[in-house]
Each structure stands twice: as structure tokens, then as C-alpha cells.
């Protein structure tokens, strides 16, 4: 992915953990579109992206067309674990296809849903087995759609199959700075080498 994690070349789509990447100074504002608590359905249909000197709100597919990133890394699913796997994949597929239609020149990389630590008492409804099911379904979806799959979950998982406790806030599912750095390092060291297909990079907000 991230041999090109520079400037406007990569854009990260996510919810709360990507907000934390920005808040911890690990990525720039030009590199992400994120909002805490969103799932795939909201990401497709709601205007959650804004730009400076522009009062309009844009959906993620619309924003991708405006930002013209070389690559898009998508990390959704934490806020979707209450739905059936088939519904999650249907929403995710629709989101990917909307981005492809809006801006066909970007390489889409689908990242795994992050694991949760064994102690996630603040979020008792979260289920690691469901997350594993989501990630297996995401791999199959990527193969069917011809987009890339990134298994960053392996950088966060311990030998017990849960997230490494030191990477998470106690009793929580959100990553601390050390966990965020582990994810970002994984993205950077699992580079995807492709040609830059963008016709131009002009007029990026």
C-alpha cells in the first residue's frame, strides 16, 4: 500500500481509529476521511466529508473524486458487527463500486476489521469470532471484485487470537498510539506496486 504514503497519493477511509491516527499526528488531514461511529451504509449514503472554504457536505465516493488519491485504504466493520455478514458485504461492495464509478483511477485496498482485545468490557457486544467471519468474507469479496486485501489484523493480534492488550485502551476496543503506529507501519511495509493511473492531480481541495 504505502510505498506512496505521501501527500495526496494515499487516502485512508475509516472511522474512529483513523480519527485517532490524525489526532496523534500520524497522518495529515489531506490523507483521510473519517468520522467516529460510522459504518459502511453511512459511508456510502451520508455527506460526512467537508473541505475548507466549501460549505457543502460530500459522501465518501464524491470526496474521493475530488481528492484524486492514488490509493484508498478502507477500514470499515467495527461499527457493523451487529449486522449479518452477508449484509455487511453487500454494503461494502456497494461502497467500493460507488468509489470506482466516482473515480476509477484510484487503487482500492480493503483493510481488515481490527481485532478486539480479550478485555473489551466497555464494549461487551463486540465479538472476535464475528470479526474473524467479517475478515474472511472481506477476503472473498476482494477476490470477486478484483481489489486488494490488506491483513493488518495480523499486526495487532496476539497468540490468543485477540488484539494485543498493550495496543488498546484498557477495557476498550480503540487503539492507543503504540497500536496505531503498529497499523501504520504495517501499511507502509506492505507496499502495493502499481502504476499511477490518475490523469491529473489538479484542483484538489
Tell where the protein language model's regions lie, with residue ranges.
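Structural recognition of the beta-strand scaffold that forms the well-ordered cores
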Residues: 13, 31-34, 70-76, 107-112, ...
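Catalytic His-Asp segment of secreted/periplasmic serine-dependent ester chemistry enzymes
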Residues: 116-205
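Acidic/histidine-rich helix-loop elements
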Residues: 26-55, 82, 172
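Generic structural signal for well-ordered alpha-helices
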Residues: 92-97, 135
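Oxyanion-hole/transition-state-stabilizing segment in secreted/luminal serine hydrolases
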Residues: 54-89, 114-119
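Active-site segments of SGNH/GDSL-like serine hydrolases
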Residues: 75, 79, 97-132, 154
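Single conserved hydrophobic/aromatic residue that forms the stacking wall/gate
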Residues: 1-7, 11-12
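Solvent-exposed loop/turn segments at secondary-structure junctions
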Residues: 16-20, 37-41, 78-83, 114-118, ...
